[in-house]
Amino acid sequence: MPQSNIHPGSIIEPGAKIGKNVTIEAYAVIKGTVSLGDNVVVKSHAYIDGNTTIGDGTIIWPSASVGTKAQDLKYRGEKTFVEIGKRCEIREFVTINSSCQENSVVRIGDDCLIMAYCHVAHNCEIGNRVIMANNSMLAGHVVVE
């Protein structure tokens, strides 16, 4: 059975759930109640926080920031979620914020490519097989099918 490869220079908080055959590179940070599916790769300096679930086979590239606090003045610390589907690529310097209303979800479907420097704001929903080109930005509550 394949073993996970977790670099000793990464930071993983005790609440995280790590699937099978996961790779976490040096200086990656996993905080909160993050759940990584099987065969996930988290590259160096990626930052994953909050109530975030990342599906099997997804790759989080260097310096991506996933599950961080919503950039919305209405957000007051409610429990919110981020869900990223299977086989996605979240490229360099992408930011994916959490939602801003109690028990709401920012959702990215399966087989998506979110290219470098994209931003996905609070309460967005992205369907399956979506490609966001470099520097694309979604404001809050946007749905892309």
Regions found by a protein language model. Name each.
Residues 4-145:
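Structural signal for interior beta-strand "rungs" in well-ordered beta-sheet cores
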